[in-house]
């Protein structure tokens, strides 16, 4: 399985940070601070780093889904003069140290915006590209040679998703491929519609074409969801997928057999 954990992020002329490094824990990180202190800045800098992984795909992830540095991300500073002009500091750079691939090797790379209205570039080579191209080749063969390839989980969950589902109306017919989940995965308004439709399709195809025998992928996803809620579930409770609910197919099944969609449960 490929490991991909961000270990360090360094911001140089990125928004309000002139030169700041953050060392991250591989399991969980919590940023606390007042409004405007830079919490979201660090999260979106991590998004720029994750964009480097998506940029390594040449076939299966279109470049429009890669999160880049924007011109407005460059740090602004006021010149001490009679007219107090606001200048843009450059270059704007996000550097990263990360654990990568099955050997858990440490890699480093940086993404740079050199000038206003320019394009985000790599400060050197993308160290993930060779491995990703090998994955794409195995996927393209369509001969199960990619069976042992377990792709990294990459997802940005911004608070913007709470009031607007940016890809709710995304329409895609046919069976979703294993890389389709990377589409919109770094969007600030990313929703769960694609994931829910993938689960729904797995079950429907199993009924229609596999004599009702559930695919292993469906069982693994359901196990993973239950594992995530393990400490919160009471005896006899479990998480199920139920397509009877339009907006939310994840539901809680109580020990008495009552099925409650997640949208009916309180945030507490």
Predicted region positions:
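Extended helical coiled-coil dimerization/tether regions that scaffold
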Residues: 2, 99, 181-267
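GG-anchored amphipathic helix commonly corresponding to the ABC/SMC/Rad50 NBD signature/C-loop
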Residues: 49, 267-268
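P-loop NTPase switch/coupling surface
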Residues: 1-194, 212, 216, 230-235
């Amino acid at each position: 399985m490929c490991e991909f954990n961000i270990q360090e992020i360094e911001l140089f002329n990125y928004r309000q940070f002139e030169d700041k490094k953050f060392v991250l824990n591989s399991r969980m990180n919590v940023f606390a601070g007042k409004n405007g202190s830079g919490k979201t800045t660090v999260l979106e800098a991590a998004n720029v780093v994750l964009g480097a992984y998506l940029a390594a795909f040449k076939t299966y992830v279109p470049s429009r889904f890669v999160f880049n540095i924007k011109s407005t991300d460059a740090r602004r500073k006021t010149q001490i003069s009679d007219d107090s002009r606001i200048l843009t500091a450059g270059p704007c750079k996000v550097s990263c140290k990360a654990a990568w691939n099955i050997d858990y090797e440490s890699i480093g790379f940086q993404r740079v915006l050199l000038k206003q209205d320019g394009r985000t570039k790599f400060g050197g080579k993308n160290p993930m590209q060779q491995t990703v191209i090998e994955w794409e080749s195995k996927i393209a063969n369509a001969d199960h040679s990619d069976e042992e390839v377990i792709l990294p989980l990459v997802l940005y969950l911004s608070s913007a998703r709470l009031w607007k589902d940016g890809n709710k109306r995304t329409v895609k017919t046919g069976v979703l491929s294993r890389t389709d989940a990377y589409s919109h995965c770094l969007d600030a308004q990313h929703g769960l519609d694609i994931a829910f439709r993938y689960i729904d399709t797995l079950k429907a195809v199993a009924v229609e074409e596999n004599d009702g025998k559930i695919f292993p992928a469906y069982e693994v996803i359901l196990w993973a969801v239950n594992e995530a809620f393990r400490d919160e579930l009471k005896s006899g409770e479990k998480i199920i997928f139920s397509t009877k609910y339009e907006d939310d197919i994840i539901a809680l099944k109580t020990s008495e057999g009552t099925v409650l969609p997640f949208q009916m449960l309180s945030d507490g």
